[in-house]
């Protein structure tokens, strides 16, 4: 059985958004911390903090909503590179999500970053997910 912590994180955020929860609880790993940091820098989530449990650490991700009807800032999340089929792109082939309205998150040799940052630095890598 393959554990895909990135897909678990995206699913946790998606489910919490649909249920209009204030926070989403996800498993805390190095990559989920980096992904949460990128989401915070892009303004897609309010904040995140790590909670230490006896068995396993968790990340509490505070979600962002807009308007009186509490529409989520994150409308969709899509996992691209999966354990069974990895997806890579060099700096010339980096995808533009919804014509620049969304972001693609990449894992590069310089760390985890958005497509815009990777384009600016001129480095490619593994395309982890699309968020818009």
Curated annotation (Swiss-Prot):
Q: Which UniProt keywords apply?
A: Cyanelle, Plastid, Ribonucleoprotein, Ribosomal protein, RNA-binding, rRNA-binding
Is the Transport keyword given for this protein? no
Q: Which GO terms describe its molecular function?
A: rRNA binding; structural constituent of ribosome
InterPro entries noted in UniProt? Ribosomal_uS8, Ribosomal_uS8_CS, Ribosomal_uS8_sf
Q: Where in the cell is it found?
A: Plastid, Cyanelle
Q: List the PANTHER family hit by this protein, alphabetically.
A: 40S RIBOSOMAL PROTEIN S15A
* Subunit composition and interactions: Part of the 30S ribosomal subunit.
Its protein name is Small ribosomal subunit protein uS8c
The organism named in the record is Cyanophora paradoxa
């Amino acid at each position: 059985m393959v554990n895909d912590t990135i897909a678990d994180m995206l699913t946790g955020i998606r489910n919490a958004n649909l249920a209009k929860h204030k926070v989403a609880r996800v498993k805390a790993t190095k990559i989920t911390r980096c992904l949460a940091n990128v989401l915070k820098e892009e303004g897609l989530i309010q904040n995140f903090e790590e909670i230490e449990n006896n068995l396993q650490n968790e990340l509490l991700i505070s979600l962002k909503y807009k308007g009186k009807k509490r529409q989520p800032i994150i409308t969709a999340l899509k996992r691209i590179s999966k354990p069974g089929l990895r997806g890579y792109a060099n700096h010339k082939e980096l995808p533009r999500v919804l014509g620049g309205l969304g972001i693609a998150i990449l894992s590069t040799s310089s760390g985890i970053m958005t497509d815009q940052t990777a384009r600016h630095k001129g480095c490619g890598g593994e395309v982890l997910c699309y968020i818009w």
